[in-house]
A protein has these predicted regions:
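Short amphipathic alpha-helical segments
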Residues: 65, 87-91, 95, 188, ...
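Long, hydrophobic, well-ordered secondary-structure blocks that form the structural core
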Residues: 88-129
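Structural motif
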Residues: 82-85
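TRNA-binding/sensing appendages of the translation machinery
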Residues: 70-80
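N-terminal mitochondrial targeting presequence
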Residues: 1-17
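Polybasic, low-complexity association/targeting segments
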Residues: 62-68
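Active-site environment of non-heme Fe oxygenases that use a 2-His-1-carboxylate facial triad
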Residues: 19-61, 74, 116-271, 276-277, ...
Length: 308
């Protein structure tokens, strides 16, 4: 019997504390600031992934191109790009540094550059360890934010996903800005947000397959030290402990109903060779895929900063 999931513990250096700015639109008492922010956010839709795609030249990565990508990320919390040739791992990190992404987050399957090769390793990994980690298979990957199993003071704030080789079929990535999810929850019932910001609303239990792995409790939504909204979420039903109450059941039902099908605010992205996206850790999922003679290979880099 294989364990279906593995979490990667990281050292906790300090307890997380933050005091949101008094005029934050994400504080429930700030209705005026919220309405202004909300109206501006929703005015960016509808949007087409083709219209926000930024084409880049690896030999001339100029400020104008980077600013176009940053502008998209500021609007939708992600941006899509396409390079004109294959990139090295070193160049991927250099590219991210242009967006001020410098503090990469490693894990046990990352290389010396903190880059993870997201490809179907299902057979090899089962044979070697008896553990199946869904991102490293060709299976569907359900809605989540990256690193939701990390403590907040070690959070993943952004990530890059770069396609080196696509699948023969399938493998689309579907993205949903977590700020859109926040808007719909708050507009439906502000108490939902109050509850989702509680520090013990969602718990990830320790993994018995990893020595020293302890449980992690935290909020679903939280405001960080720079006054940005972040989200910890997974649609998984196993190995997740939510607080139990009638209100929390209603909240979960609302969230799962909202993400059950693609909607006006979701982006369906099938990455081609040399394409990728950089995201401020939005909600995302992946469809099942089938490999051809050459395996689907995406490079992933995670960061503790976000694109600003």
């Amino acid at each position: 019997m294989f364990s279906k999931y593995i979490f990667y513990p990281i050292k906790i250096h300090h307890k997380y504390h933050t005091i949101p700015m008094m005029n934050s639109p994400f504080l429930l008492e700030n209705q005026t600031e919220y309405k202004k922010w909300r109206d501006n956010k929703l005015a960016q839709y509808p949007a087409s992934k083709d219209k926000i795609l930024v084409k880049l030249n690896d030999s001339n990565l100029n400020d104008n191109s980077i600013n176009l990508l940053r502008d998209s990320i500021n609007k939708y919390n992600f941006g899509i790009y396409e390079f004109n040739s294959k990139l090295t791992n070193e160049y991927l990190k250099k590219f991210c540094s242009k967006l001020k992404l410098l503090q990469s987050v490693s894990n046990l399957l990352a290389d010396e550059n903190d880059i993870s090769n997201i490809t179907n390793q299902n057979t090899e990994r089962k044979q070697s360890s008896g553990i199946e980690y869904i991102p490293y298979t060709n299976k569907q990957l359900n809605w989540h934010t990256d690193g939701y199993y990390y403590p907040i003071d070690s959070a993943v704030k952004s990530f890059l996903l770069h396609c080196e080789h696509p699948a023969k079929s399938g493998g689309e990535n579907i993205l949903l800005d977590h700020e859109i999810m926040y808007i719909f929850l708050r507009d439906h019932n502000p108490d939902y947000i109050k509850i989702l910001m509680q520090n013990d609303i969602m718990e990830i239990p320790g993994n018995k397959n990893i020595k020293g792995s302890g449980s992690i409790k935290g909020p679903v939504f939280y405001i960080d030290e720079k006054n940005f909204l972040n989200m910890r979420f997974t649609s998984r039903q196993q190995n997740i402990i939510w607080q139990k109450s009638d209100m929390i059941k209603k909240i979960k039902d609302y969230i799962f109903s909202f993400i059950a099908e693609d909607n006006y605010y979701t982006f369906n992205i099938l990455l081609r060779e040399n394409q990728g996206y950089i995201a401020n850790n939005v909600l995302h999922k992946r469809k099942e895929y089938v490999d051809g003679d050459k395996k689907r290979l995406l490079k992933r880099l995670r960061f503790s900063e976000r694109v600003e």
